[in-house]
Amino acid sequence: MAGQDPALSTSHPFYDVARHGILQVAGDDRFGRRVVTFSCCRMPPSHELDHQRLLEYLKYTLDQYVENDYTIVYFHYGLNSRNKPSLGWLQSAYKEFDRKDGDLTMWPRLVSNSKLKRSSHLSLPKYWDYRYKKNLKALYVVHPTSFIKVLWNILKPLISHKFGKKVIYFNYLSELHEHLKYDQLVIPPEVLRYDEKLQSLHEGRTPPPTKTPPPRPPLPTQQFGVSLQYLKDKNQGELIPPVLRFTVTYLREKGLRTEGLFRRSASVQTVREIQRLYNQGKPVNFDDYGDIHIPAVILKTFLRELPQPLLTFQAYEQILGITCVESSLRVTGCRQILRSLPEHNYVVLRYLMGFLHAVSRESIFNKMNSSNLACVFGLNLIWPSQGVSSLSALVPLNMFTELLIEYYEKIFSTPEAPGEHGLAPWEQGSRAAPLQEAVPRTQATGLTKPTLPPSPLMAARRRL
């Protein structure tokens, strides 16, 4: 079936709906928010699709991201009289997404569905806490028609002014470039062909130009969008990239107990300003911005803009197989996968996971346990070399990330074979000086270099 995810299991609680490929997760937008796409052209005729099941599947999917800021891209092309839901259904759907904080009127009917009983996502506390509209930061409607305008007028009395400001219309796909990572979007071929037709019929007018700048050599002080090797070469052999070190140190000192850390987005203007300062080698003082979520967004942005994911393209297929490993052997499986990483990637990953493990240990305050952190960081650590990760791929990707965070000490405390990773310089005891003493205290950014926290391995050795 066109659009179906080949990795989709028939045991999926919503297989009857998911097999059509109507919903896809397409990485993050330029604001660091998770992107979910909805493609009308993949909706079968109404007699072949239970629209109530579609609504429940949409909620099931969004429930994985609703605690974080997120974006929806709605591809309107392909909606017709044969597959169009009724206006009454649309009104009831909007009202259901407006339910929150203890509205249980839908609960008995939902749990009575035998297929939903097998799904663990519908626990009562999580249903109470649905915040679909609150954390939806943008709804991009692509190729709107007169039907959309009529529908908007019908639903307008139900839609708040604040929510209405989140809806943005795009006549052409090219208009998405400014807001999203276009190459990560899962766009059906039918939508691409329709967009080409629209442009050719637009009376010779050229479509809105994309704002992708021409490629330029990176600055010597460049921090974003360059490889780990480039950062090492330009920072006197430092293995931990300066942006990663400074944001982690700041968050360790001031953000570990911040509720919802890493869940919120930040102003794109602020993010770009900080990126510009870092790339120009200028100092950044996060205290000046007065928002602890800004360095958290900068950290995710740095990982997301690496030319190759920190876990590397080569490890992608191995990581997808983690769900096939027996539960008791998964930690060992993670260690085996990490053995294939380049040494530099391994050291940076260990540093990052040590920090995220510390965040998870404060989850009673910040509400960010290893599972929640994995949902945020999974797609920032690994993605395929071509296209984007499918919805079904998110399960193993997030599981792998959760294991790295939850079992950090077991996975990273014992070094691999000497020829592979060995000990990082700051974990080599008397054989090497600590990293913070092995390089100058001032980096290209002009900031004072923070002191590394002791690693669990070093602490264990001291106890011995």
UniProtKB/Swiss-Prot annotation:
- Give the start-end ranges of region Disordered: 439-464
UniProt GO cellular component terms: cytoplasm; cytosol
Q: Which PROSITE patterns match?
A: CRAL_TRIO, RHOGAP
GO biological process per UniProt? negative regulation of endocytic recycling; positive regulation of ERK1 and ERK2 cascade; regulation of small GTPase mediated signal transduction; small GTPase-mediated signal transduction
Q: Please, which domain of life does this record's source organism belong to? A: Eukaryota
This molecule's function is given as: GTPase activator for the Rho-type GTPases by converting them to an inactive GDP-bound state.
Name assigned to this protein: Rho GTPase-activating protein 8
Q: Which organism is it from?
A: Homo sapiens
